[in-house]
């Protein structure tokens, strides 16, 4: 990799660290090409990205970003998973790490908050933004459904009373 490519990569990573909602740092030693491809495709489906990084370049890219504190995590064969959704990248990374012991979550950052491996796991357990939006829409729709049920109830009661009168008249 020549100087221009390194400079371009540092600029790209700086943009990632400055703008990502969350960054997860992990060791990937021992993963096969197929496993890495599988992980990347899972990340893409979730709206996240997974990138193998050179430690020195990643540390340079961290300068001037809110995530400068995670520089110590970049030692050994490291990769980053990142996304705008604060739950997407951690969720996919933790699920993959459960299936494959060779992906070791080291920690990460969410904004200026440094996360250890345990915090990344807790973040992965939270519902995603889409799931939260669906729950909110459901909560908003529930009162409307109940109101419709209450409004329809008197009509149903009237029909049952009339049916009882008709049945009583036939029996007599």
From Swiss-Prot:
Coiled coil regions, renumbered to chain: none
A GO molecular-function annotation: structural constituent of ribosome
Xref: Gene3D superfamilies: 3.30.70.1730, 6.10.250.290
GO annotation, cellular component aspect: large ribosomal subunit
Keyword tags: Ribonucleoprotein, Ribosomal protein, RNA-binding, rRNA-binding
One matching Pfam family: Ribosomal_L10
InterPro entries in the cross-refs: Ribosomal_uL10 (IPR001790), Ribosomal_uL10-like_sf (IPR043141), Ribosomal_uL10_bac (IPR022973), Ribosomal_uL10_bac_type (IPR047865), Ribosomal_uL10_CS_bac (IPR002363)
PROSITE patterns (UniProt xref): RIBOSOMAL_L10
GO terms under biological process: translation
SUPFAM superfamilies: Ribosomal protein L10-like
HAMAP family in alphabetical order: Ribosomal_uL10
Family in the record: Belongs to the universal ribosomal protein uL10 family.
Subunit structure: Part of the ribosomal stalk of the 50S ribosomal subunit. The N-terminus interacts with L11 and the large rRNA to form the base of the stalk. The C-terminus forms an elongated spine to which L12 dimers bind in a sequential fashion forming a multimeric L10(L12)X complex.
Entries under PANTHER family matching the protein: 39S RIBOSOMAL PROTEIN L10, MITOCHONDRIAL (PTHR11560)
UniProt function note: Forms part of the ribosomal stalk, playing a central role in the interaction of the ribosome with GTP-bound translation factors.
Protein name per Swiss-Prot or TrEMBL: Large ribosomal subunit protein uL10
Taxonomic source organism: Parvibaculum lavamentivorans (strain DS-1 / DSM 13023 / NCIMB 13966)
High-level lineage: Bacteria, Pseudomonadati, Pseudomonadota, Alphaproteobacteria, Hyphomicrobiales
């Amino acid at each position: 990799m020549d100087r221009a490519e390194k400079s371009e990569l540092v600029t790209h990573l700086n943009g990632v660290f400055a703008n990502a909602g969350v960054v997860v740092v992990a060791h990937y030693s021992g993963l096969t090409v197929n496993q890495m491809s599988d992980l990347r495709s899972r990340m893409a489906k979730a709206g996240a990205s997974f990138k193998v990084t050179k430690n020195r370049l990643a540390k340079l890219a961290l300068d001037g970003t809110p995530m400068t504190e995670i520089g110590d995590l970049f030692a050994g064969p490291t990769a980053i998973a990142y996304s705008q959704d604060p739950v997407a990248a951690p969720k996919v990374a933790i699920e993959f790490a459960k299936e494959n012991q060779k992906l070791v979550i080291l920690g990460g950052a969410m904004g200026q908050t440094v996360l250890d491996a345990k915090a990344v796991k807790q973040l992965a357990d939270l519902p995603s933004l889409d799931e939260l939006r669906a729950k909110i829409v459901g909560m908003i729709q529930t009162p409307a459904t109940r109101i419709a049920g209450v409004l329809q109830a008197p009509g149903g009661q009237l029909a049952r009373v009339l049916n009882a009168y008709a049945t009583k008249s036939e029996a007599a």
